[in-house]
Design a protein with these regions (language model features):
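Short glycine/proline- and aromatic-enriched beta-strand/turn motifs that initiate or cap beta-hairpins
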Residues: 20-70, 76-83, 115, 177-197
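Ser/Thr- (and often Asn-) enriched beta-sheet segments in non-cytosolic proteins
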Residues: 58, 130-132, 156
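Hydrophobic beta-strand positions in extracellular immunoglobulin-like domains
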Residues: 115, 140, 154-156
Length: 197
């Protein structure tokens, strides 16, 4: 009997939080996720004197992206994009990396640093080759309503070791891509003006 009383007294003395009858606070922010599609226009980064072999230098295509924002002003972006030229030439990228954003009412400017894999398809489907690739980008998301967003963005890509691995290619490869798209928002509080939404 005394042992049980002593253990109870020690437990309540050492852990006073056990005496509280209030509930623990709940999380105040939900995870925000967007999934969207893009239409892209690109300068493929091919030297202008290579148009005889590689065709036109204004590529067009599209892609998909997803953003996951676990905290205010910081998130993660994943994207896949493919742009097409002529002569069977196309460029495809698979990227992931951090993004940083600010909120101003319905406007959300952002910047991102992505890394991933890039694939170049050579003229007339002769061959394709993959490279490690890095991207610096930025843009603006505009909230139409609680679930739909419009996006405009620019990306500068650097395909590492392209110029050294591709024989007789006129220089390195650094595509520039402008994209416009729309996304659907899941979770979070899209109508809140605090934090992101």
């Amino acid at each position: 009997m005394y042992l049980k009383t002593i253990i109870t007294a020690l437990a309540l003395g050492l852990f006073p939080s056990l005496l509280m009858s209030q509930a623990m606070p709940t999380a105040s922010r939900q995870l925000n996720v967007q999934v969207g599609g893009l239409f892209s226009m690109a300068n493929p980064g091919i030297a202008s004197d290579a148009t005889i072999v590689y065709g036109q230098m204004n590529f067009k295509g599209g892609g998909l992206y997803a953003t996951i924002d676990p905290a205010d002003h910081f998130g993660l972006e994943m994207s896949v994009r493919q742009v097409f030229g002529t002569e069977g030439v196309h460029e495809r990228t698979y990227d992931v990396g951090p993004r940083f954003y600010l909120s101003h009412g319905r406007f959300m400017p952002y910047g991102k640093v992505l890394f991933g894999r890039a694939v170049f398809n050579f003229p007339n489907n002769f061959a394709n080759q993959a490279f490690t690739e890095g991207t610096l980008g930025g843009g603006l998301d505009y909230r139409l309503n609680s679930v739909l967003y419009l996006r405009g963005e620019y990306e500068y890509q650097r395909w590492f070791s392209f110029g050294t691995q591709v024989t007789a290619f006129p220089g390195s490869l650094s595509p520039s891509v402008a994209s416009f798209g729309v996304s659907y928002h899941f979770g979070g509080n899209a109508d809140c003006e605090c934090g992101r939404y």
